[in-house]
Amino acid sequence: MKKFTIADFSIYKTQTKKITMITAYDFNHAQLIAESLIDTILVGDSLGMVVQGSNNTLNVSLNDILYHTKAVRCGAPDKFIVADMPYLSYHLDSKTTIQNAGTLICAGGADAVKLEINNVNMLSQISSLTDAQIPVIAHIGMTPQSVNVFGGFKVQGKNTEQVQHIEKMAQLAQDAGASAIVIECVPSSVAQKITETLLIPTIGIGAGNCCDGQVLVLNDLLGMSKHTPKFAKQYLDGKS
């Protein structure tokens, strides 16, 4: 099967083909996904919760993501892999951001990196990375690295101010050079409007079924998570 590439994000959007993305953190699960029709794998900082057992993603380090990205690449050599940039790995300056992203690409084997964008100050990092020829996926809405600012993992876009902010971040992320945008935990109407407005594809998680694709945490689907989100269909009871 032909490997999904960064160019396919826009091609799928044009052809109205749904993009499929799922998380993986180790060699064995990556092998299973490698044999499936899933388009892309996300090595997410969600590993802090589903692998390391933390209450949030803030403790995940660049070395953690690098380690797991290497393992996933070994298990899925022909899959498109997106590596999360963990908290504080892209918040300091452009030089550090490029170095950290470059490590995930060159040493980890990732094809692209994902950044959570919750304010305009983060947009310059997208531009810096794309200028360095590193593909970027932006992440808006309920951005888990902002959990302490939100006061918990709460749905975003429930009032006019939040909706306008999310829509603005989506447009500016596209303008900065993002190849796609993950939209997490916002009302489906908000995600639908953004999807219809942008030229780049949207990938939803807990954002309804109107996005150009969906991403889910593998552990949720297998019933292995402590708390499975309502939007995640559970195919197995991995805890039994």
State where each predicted segment sits.
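Alpha/beta enzyme core
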Residues: 2-240
